[in-house]
């Protein structure tokens, strides 16, 4: 009975460790995606910032 308890404990422990490693990798991947989205949004904001009044990109001579 003692051997059965030890092996069951070992299986559960290894499963828990494996699960926590997978969760950590998943969390890191989600953080990377969020950082990429934030970066893209800031680039879009920079592209479409309002132009100051009287500014013309092309000068007429």
UniProtKB/Swiss-Prot annotation:
Main location: secreted
Any one GO BP annotation for this protein: defense response
Segment forming the signal sequence: 1-22
Keyword Secreted belongs to the record: yes
Biased amino acid composition, Acidic residues: 30-42
Keywords in alphabetical order: Amphibian defense peptide, G-protein coupled receptor impairing toxin, Hydroxylation, Secreted, Signal, Toxin
Top-level taxonomic group: Eukaryota
Keyword Secreted: yes
Coiled-coil annotated spans: none
Tissue: Expressed by the skin glands.
Entry's Gene Ontology cellular component terms: extracellular region
Gene Ontology terms for molecular function: toxin activity
List of residues that carry 4-hydroxyproline: 52
InterPro entries noted in UniProt: Frog_antimicrobial_propeptide
Propeptide: 23-50
Annotated region (Disordered), positions in chain: 25-61
Pfam families reported for this sequence: FSAP_sig_propep
Subcellular location: Secreted
Family: Belongs to the frog skin active peptide (FSAP) family. Bradykinin-related peptide subfamily.
Entry function: [Val1,Hyp2,Thr6]-bradykinin-Gln,Ser: Induces contraction of rat ileum smooth muscle (EC(50)=710 nM) but has no activity towards smooth muscle from tail artery, urinary bladder or uterus up to concentrations of 100 uM. Binds to both bradykinin receptor B1 (BDKRB1) and B2 (BDKRB2); the effect via BDKRB1 is stronger. Induces contraction of guinea pig ileum smooth muscle.
Descriptive protein name: [Val1,Thr6]-bradykinyl-Gln,Ser
């Amino acid at each position: 009975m003692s051997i059965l308890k030890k092996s069951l404990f070992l299986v559960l422990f290894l499963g828990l460790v494996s699960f926590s490693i997978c969760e950590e990798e998943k969390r890191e991947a989600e953080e990377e995606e969020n950082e990429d989205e934030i970066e893209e949004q800031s680039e879009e904001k920079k592209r479409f910032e309002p132009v100051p009044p009287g500014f013309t990109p092309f000068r007429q001579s």
